[in-house]
Amino acid sequence: SGILQINILIGTIIASYETGAVSFLYYADRIYQLPLALIGIAIGIVLLPSISKKIKENKKLSINKTIEKTIVYSMLLAIPASVALYVMPEIIISFLFERGAFDAISTHNSSMALKVFSLGLIAFILVKILTPIFFANENSKLPLNFSIITVILNTLLSIFLFLELGFLGIAAATVISSWFNVVLLYFYLFKNKYFSHSNEIFAPLFVILVVSSLLGFYLFVIKNVYLSLSFSNFFYDALFFITILISGLVVFFTMISFYKPFNYVNLKKQILSDE
């Protein structure tokens, strides 16, 4: 989103006062932007017209169900992605970038930044879900005001945390300010009855959290196997990396499918449903 890019720009300016920090943040940013783009942008494009249509038809219950469904299915992708980025940042960064001037130290520092950014991936995506609800209700002023508040908070936090933690403080400031933005958006939506979720949303989210935790344990174990082998051949390195990626997806979606609403048939039916 625009607010996230502004926060990153501010962070980049502040990071320029530490040698190499801009590069560390840049490479970490490139990685987490991929799931953010795939999930967040698609959600925004699909959600806004659907919500706008239902607001005009005054289908309040249907609006809430659509938003709930969007949150659940975006979290079905965002939470495991966040876990994977947190558990395996060094493997991802090393495989994609560690060559030439980008050495092991650069990999370590970029990996630490990616680990911090991964804690904000869910918040970045929730902002993309909640903001269109304001636009669908023809209220673009409040998200703008919240964005300004978030930018100010991010700037102050970036300066303070940079002095304490270096470039990692900038990543932390971006994450904290994004979660703060989520809180502002959510409570205003809830307070003004733009959106009110039911208790039914908690069970699937809990299942996603549990299965994602199991995925995290699996990735942690296989990561240590990968690091102990220390391939010097790029072909074998790439083969093992792809194996980790595919096996992680298989493990997650196999486990999650045991929860009936997330098995293939019900998942397909719910995604295609307009309710």
Could you tell me what each predicted segment is?
Residues 1-275:
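Membrane-embedded alpha-helical bundles of multi-pass transporters/translocases
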